[in-house]
């Protein structure tokens, strides 16, 4: 089975007025093609910080340790340019945040929001984006995707 993602010795710290807070300490795991992986733990244990690190979303005052390695298909992604991060986030890897209200716009339909991301990253027509979005909803088990797209 091919390795898709490998995280080695991930450590993330944040500078606060009280000093450095280590949010993630020496986390390592591998995700193989075709496998399902869950990051589980109690509140505040670093699940979201780990996921954000993989997505390149840790910003100051946070910092991923220089000793950490995040390899996507064997390539170290930590030094990606802005353009490379945009391509990675849109084409290769995605994240679904737990708090839907913080991540989704309640004034737009689900379909429109998914289509928007598809069109930004794939440069396809509205119809193609609609079909792909509906297919994505069906793949994750959402019933009646054509109806849900309009909600």
Predicted regions and their residues:
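ABC transporter nucleotide-binding domains
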Residues: 1-151
